[in-house]
């Protein structure tokens, strides 16, 4: 077994020009902690990185010199975020509370837009269903059925086994309003954590008073990015066309106008779809407010 590991190790070095490939799981000051074959290597970056404006992020796959503990190259990213500074996220669980805090379609659409713009799969995870009455719950799930129809996964935090399956072999983040139930969900996934609200980082191995840094952990056959939380997107970084294209259902209604923003034209196919109840009215109104911010 040991000989096999040595051979695999040597093959990897040969394939990568003498360097090893790993993933940055934590950055503290100028030390970048690279995970490789079950070990953690505190590495520094090549001096030329600064000159070339290369900033390694948590989540980056890199080539590094195992002996000198130097990161030689940052490999291409599938995506990257500025706040927090992370990369290569596969999916985001948008923890969506139905009460305390109240259900917000505006926030939900804003987070969905954020993930679409970054090429991240979004999973809507519903919490606190027991705090709303049956009639209100039915109305909310009628709305959520629309999100299912346009391609989003909607799941209850009670469906633990399905969530575990979704976590497998993926790099995930949990995001949502403060108090939406992220700690409660982690407790359900792993009762041994016994988390109090706001103690996610402590359960993952941090002291209560440590400075918050982004960190990537192994979690249920996948990886979980523990972050201070995703900020709302800065709309000025994107064009109105970017935002339009990130509303995935609009493409189902081809508009006769080239580069139509679906705001004014009377014959616009998207506007017609809203009137015909084929596009959720609240989602269209949120779209209008988002592109207004992007001007």
Regions found by a protein language model. Name each.
Residues 131-180:
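Canonical P-loop GTPase G-domain recognition
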Residues 99-149:
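Phosphate-binding glycine-rich loops and their immediate beta-loop-alpha structural context
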Residues 19, 169, 192:
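Short coil/loop residues immediately preceding or within conserved phosphate-binding loops
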Residues 30, 53-62, 66-68, 75-92, ...:
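Helix-rich effector regions associated with P-loop NTPase G domains
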Residues 3-103:
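N-terminal accessory targeting/assembly segments
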Residues 72, 153-155, 225:
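General small-molecule cofactor/ligand-binding pocket signal
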Residues 183-195:
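A conserved segment at the C-terminal end of the G1
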Residues 171-179, 183-186, 214-216, 221-225:
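Conserved active-site beta-strand-loop modules that form the wall/rim of enzyme catalytic pockets
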């Amino acid at each position: 077994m040991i000989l096999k590991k040595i051979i695999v190790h040597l093959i990897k070095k040969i394939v990568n020009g003498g360097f090893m490939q790993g993933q940055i799981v934590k950055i503290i000051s100028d030390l970048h902690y690279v995970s490789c074959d079950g070990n953690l290597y505190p590495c520094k970056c090549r001096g030329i990185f600064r000159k070339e404006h290369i900033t390694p992020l948590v989540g980056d796959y890199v080539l590094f010199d195992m002996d000198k503990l130097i990161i030689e190259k940052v490999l291409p990213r599938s995506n990257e975020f500025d706040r927090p500074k992370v990369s290569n996220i596969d999916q985001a669980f948008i923890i969506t509370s139905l009460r305390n805090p109240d259900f917000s379609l505006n926030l939900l659409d804003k987070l969905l837009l954020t993930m679409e713009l970054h090429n991240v799969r979004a999973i809507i995870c519903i919490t606190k269903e027991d705090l709303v009455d049956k009639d209100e719950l039915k109305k909310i799930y009628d709305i959520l059925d629309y999100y299912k129809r346009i391609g989003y996964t909607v799941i209850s935090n009670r469906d633990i086994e399905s969530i575990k399956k979704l976590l497998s072999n993926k790099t995930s983040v949990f995001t949502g309003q403060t108090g939406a139930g992220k700690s409660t969900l982690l407790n359900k996934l792993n009762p041994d954590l016994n988390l109090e609200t706001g103690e996610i980082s402590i359960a993952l191995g941090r002291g209560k008073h440590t400075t918050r840094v982004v960190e990537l952990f192994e979690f249920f056959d996948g990886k979980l990015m523990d972050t201070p939380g995703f900020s709302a997107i800065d709309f000025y970084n994107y064009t109105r066309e970017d935002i339009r294209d990130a509303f995935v259902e609009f493409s189902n209604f081809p508009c006769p106008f080239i580069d139509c923003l679906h705001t004014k034209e009377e014959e616009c196919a998207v506007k017609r779809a809203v009137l015909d109840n084929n596009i959720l009215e609240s989602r269209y109104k949120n779209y209008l407010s988002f592109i207004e911010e992007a001007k």
